[in-house]
């Protein structure tokens, strides 16, 4: 049996981060039965503080918001921790101070996916470059440097180069990351799909469980303070007569809307609200991906300003799901018609096969 350890943002209380960690784990377990797979349970002080219910470095505005919604946000924290500790195959917990290669007996180490190599991430650590591993084989899967990684100081660029040079196989999430690394490193690299796309609809459906919300609804999932998305959701709610459910607090607006708050939403609940929604509005990459996996009527706004989201929509034949906020009622009606996901499913199967072949080669499978 081969032993594989994966290091990733598995404990970030972020839907995409936790679910991509789960997806890569399950894909390897399903396709490589001779592999014992564990996620290295790195819990840095910075990451724990960042995702605590009451972050010390948060603004006074956000702290007031937390007080106002404390019980929901505490439940959300509990839901994330429950998922991390029951659904992920973890090693014992390590901090940035006590993690060493001698504590493990892995034959292979994987970095990825997510933005683990993005030095601008608030919870970044050089440990995600597997700096503590000196002997075993290292590879990456669908990892990202983020958009600005190599615009850092020459010292940082040199450190990234030295770290990545020790990897035997390199798979990155975005072409931009490949282009950046190719400027400083002469090694073969390939682009692979985000881990959440590795698993088929039926696996995610089973994880999502029985329907939580009994009435019809629109699910709105956005990452930032997006007035246009809020206004569009309000308009669509009036047009369809369906309520809007939101899972993510955006404090400047959360006191002034008539949406249904579900701020206690953990990873499983997030999947559930997308799966059973009548319509999904999202400006998030993972929101768009899961809506597509569940074959829901997806609406996204201004995706052309977000390269990652736009490339996904174009690649999978879903560019027509991207709209301007001021579209007329006739255009809205077209959006609510049945969506053709044939191209998406065909292209996805090809990409899943590419990822399988990459991992088979990287893990030395016959």
Positions of predicted regions on the chain:
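Active-site anion-handling motifs in enzyme catalytic cores
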Residues: 1-366
